[in-house]
Amino acid sequence: MTTSPGVPEPSAQLLRLAAEVRQAAMALGQSDDNQRRKALMAMANALLSSSEQIVRANQLDLEKARTEGLASALMARLRLDESKLNSAIEGLRQLAQLTDPLGLRQLHRELDQDLVLERITVPLGVLGVIFEARPDAVIQITSLAIRSGNGALLKGGSEASHTNQAIIEALKNGLAETEIDPEAIALLKTRQESLALLRLDGLVDLIIPRGSNELVRFIQDNTRIPVLGHADGICHLYLDAAADLKQALQIAIDSKTQYPAACNSIETLLIHQSIAPSFLELAIPAFLQAGVRLLGDSASRALGVEESASEEDWATEYLDLILSVKVVPDLEGALDHIRRYSSRHTEAIVSNDQETAERFLQAVDSAGVFHNCSTRFADGFRYGFGAEVGISTQTLPPRGPVGLEGLVTYRYRLRGQGHIVADYANGECMFTHRDLPL
């Protein structure tokens, strides 16, 4: 996409900052595994030492957000208490222990004697990350960037300005004690800078938006830089005729209420008509007790769901304690609904019929398709990636939770001894194309 007239040209100051990040990123990309491991551990220690200041800064942001009437879903994302911060720090430490994503040989092939081709993983370069009320995203993204040898330009929402600044200062202080240049990461502070970031093709290699549907769509429509992300998280849970009702209820409650503001929480519950009466008899009181507002189709309303779901509801990412409920005739009815309304993020089935479950797993074209477990498992940390920069719902890779592997590209290296193409064109030499051990 070409940028729109509403996206400003980058200022001289922003161009200078981006160039500094890129220069530092070039050195970072040539650092070794041990240097980057030590950098992450130093970042974790700095966050721990600054935890009181970070939580205090977050309280300032929360108080301001309350007075401005910030939506409850955004308030939940904005909150960074000691427990949430400690979890992020632990994720950073785990990330330091993961296998180095750089320098991995993916292909090793002899083209001819003494003419050997390799494909090696290398950093992308500089990440441009734009996110809304998610201060923990600063920790996740900067740690993933450093571990994968990438620089990062970050712009958080103004509602988290105090928290973001406190976090980035701690992270830079940690890096200053290592061989990694703290200039590899930078925090943008104004909306004008975040818009102008979209014009930094040549200095930024990938844009990663984390926020509302509107934010992601705007970025996708207004930059020439590749964009990684998803615009919606409309996730579905289908309860099959062969579902264990107790298990189904536990999974449904967890998928909706464990963290309703997350993009991997369910927005629609699909129930096979044969179990709908017995399941809803159990589920409606449980959901109401958990504070969930239920919206249903005519069949589910006849079974006790009080409010009607509109056509718009099936296509809505609530990010709140609201759940649309629909009774379907069979698996095909569930699949039809998912094909029509899914954002291709994560869908799940509860069933003790293996054949039905396999059919669901094969037929649903989403980044994550689960059987007998909560959709909330769609997360880089829970997948063992250490952390994630976001979840991609695009078909081309990377797809799903994007961790270290999604932040590297590859380079072909060819080593020869004076080889020239003319010798192969005239038939004097022949290719061997022999694969060698990786």
From Swiss-Prot:
- UniProt keyword list: Amino-acid biosynthesis, Cytoplasm, NADP, Oxidoreductase, Proline biosynthesis
- EC number(s) from the headed UniProt entry: 1.2.1.41
Give the UniProt entry's GO cellular component terms. cytoplasm
Which top-level enzyme class is recorded in the Swiss-Prot or TrEMBL entry? oxidoreductase
Q: What residue range is the signal peptide? A: none
> Its pathway?
Amino-acid biosynthesis; L-proline biosynthesis; L-glutamate 5-semialdehyde from L-glutamate: step 2/2
- Subcellular location(s) per record: Cytoplasm
Which reactions are catalysed by this chain? L-glutamate 5-semialdehyde + phosphate + NADP(+) = L-glutamyl 5-phosphate + NADPH + H(+)
What Pfam families does this protein's entry cite? Aldedh (PF00171)
**Among the record's GO biological process terms, what is one?**
L-proline biosynthetic process
One GO molecular function term? NADP binding
Q: Which family does it belong to?
A: Belongs to the gamma-glutamyl phosphate reductase family.
Matches recorded under PANTHER family: DELTA-1-PYRROLINE-5-CARBOXYLATE SYNTHASE, GLUTAMATE SEMIALDEHYDE DEHYDROGENASE
Reported function: Catalyzes the NADPH-dependent reduction of L-glutamate 5-phosphate into L-glutamate 5-semialdehyde and phosphate. The product spontaneously undergoes cyclization to form 1-pyrroline-5-carboxylate.
For this protein, the record's HAMAP family field holds: ProA
Q: What is this protein called?
A: Gamma-glutamyl phosphate reductase
